[in-house]
Amino acid sequence: MATTEGALAGVHILDLTDERGIYGAKLLADLGADVVRPEPPGGDPLRQRGPHRQGVADGSTSLWHAFFASSRRFFAVDPTTPEGAEQLRRLVERSDIVLTCDGSFGTAAVDLDTARKQQPELVVVDTS
């Protein structure tokens, strides 16, 4: 669950990163930002990364994911569908910051250049 106190309380962040940006998103969430991370249907592939609690890899026992996922909210979305792409666009509109990695999940469904023109205050961080 997102933290409600901290230096970044009230800042809304959309996390579209992959493993290259997941730690930065965790740090921002730990500082109080409301970080939302969409996942593909079936869950984020990072949920399968070991080690796993009691050696069982079922998508909910990844110790790696448990650490990096703390303080954030997750939801499933399919950005290849019109409905999923629209969900992501609405999230961008409500965000103060969008974290991306070139080619990461959901970035193809969102035109961040247009979003920046419509929301000049939007901060886009692209991690390589």
Located regions from the model:
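N-terminal helix-loop segment corresponding to the beta1-alpha1 unit
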Residues: 1-128
